[in-house]
UniProtKB/Swiss-Prot annotation:
One of its GO terms (cellular component) is cytosol. It catalyses: D-glyceraldehyde 3-phosphate = dihydroxyacetone phosphate. Homodimer. Keywords: Cytoplasm, Gluconeogenesis, Glycolysis, Isomerase. Pathway: Carbohydrate biosynthesis; gluconeogenesis; Carbohydrate degradation; glycolysis; D-glyceraldehyde 3-phosphate from glycerone phosphate: step 1/1. Its EC number is 5.3.1.1. Disulfide bonds: none annotated. Substrate binds at N8, W9, K10, G171, S210, G231, G232. GO terms for biological process: gluconeogenesis; glyceraldehyde-3-phosphate biosynthetic process; glycerol catabolic process; glycolytic process. The gene is tpiA. It comes from Francisella tularensis subsp. tularensis (strain SCHU S4 / Schu 4). It is found in: Cytoplasm. This is Triosephosphate isomerase.
Length: 253
């Protein structure tokens, strides 16, 4: 399966640093039949990034509102997302859930706004360290996915990318073990198989939790890991490009 490598730039960068980053990423060579690339800059830089990256590199927003338009100061709608030419949308990132109290219902409502568009939604799910240590991992992930799996058709679900991000491994430098990553991705796929086995086989489930150049080969080689959602390492073109190179090699072997 084609690997999907995505960079979440979060609230980082300025016009100068982003221009340098885009220039660096533009140099990487990879087979587009084996690897797909996308980046998520801050919304104010999206148009700049689209113009500075090759067309083959997807660009997305980190968040939208579930309202269409109106008196919602500071918000960005799905219509605006399409209008500026975005290809992807992050939904339900752990930082949105923890810092801005986004609920599973909010995540579903945002997903529902774009599921029938050309935008590829990347739905983030993941557990806290307390959840894992108390044996609630499977319960938490199943709950986070329940509204989506119960209310979307198989055809709609096929458009979704799922990003598993253990909250305790984001921005901490702590990486889940290979066994933990594979077991969790396998469990997520089993939830999808209950809806449709072909869907479970073909949907992309990517890993997001301190993935970097030094561990990319091992993580991306796991059978149920279809790519990565990279944070800090995506802000350095050389490191992000090396992750892309590793993905390309894995899909070539």
């Amino acid at each position: 399966m084609q690997k999907l490598i995505m960079g979440n730039w979060k609230m980082n960068g300025n016009s100068t640093s982003i221009k340098e980053l885009c220039s660096g990423i533009s140099q990487v060579q990879y087979d587009t039949s084996r690897v797909a690339i996308a980046v998520f800059p801050s919304s104010v830089y999206v148009k700049e990034v689209i113009s500075q990256l090759p067309e083959k590199v997807g660009v997305g927003l980190q968040n939208i509102t579930f309202y269409d338009d109106g008196a919602y100061t500071g918000e960005i709608s799905a219509r605006m997302l399409e209008d500026i030419g975005c290809d992807y949308l992050l939904i339900g990132h752990s930082e949105r859930r923890s810092l801005f109290a986004e609920s599973d219902e909010d995540v579903f409502k945002k997903l529902n706004k774009i599921i029938d568009t050309t935008i590829t939604p990347v739905v983030c799910i993941g557990e806290s360290l307390d959840d894992r240590q108390s044996g609630k991992l499977k319960q938490v992930l199943a709950t986070q996915l329940s509204l989506i799996l119960e209310n979307l058709s198989v055809e709609q679900l096929a458009k979704v990318v799922i990003a598993y991000e253990p909250v305790w491994a984001i921005g901490t430098g702590v990486v889940a073990s290979l066994e933990q990553i594979q077991e969790t991705h396998q469990f997520i796929r089993s939830l999808l198989a209950k809806v449709d086995e072909r869907l479970a086989k073909n949907i992309k489930i990517v890993y997001g939790g301190s993935l970097k150049a030094e561990n990319a080969k091992d993580i991306l080689s796991l059978p149920d890991v279809d790519g990565g959602l990279i944070g800090g390492a995506s802000l350095k073109a050389a490191e992000f490009n090396e992750i892309i190179n590793q993905a390309n090699k894995i899909c070539t072997e």
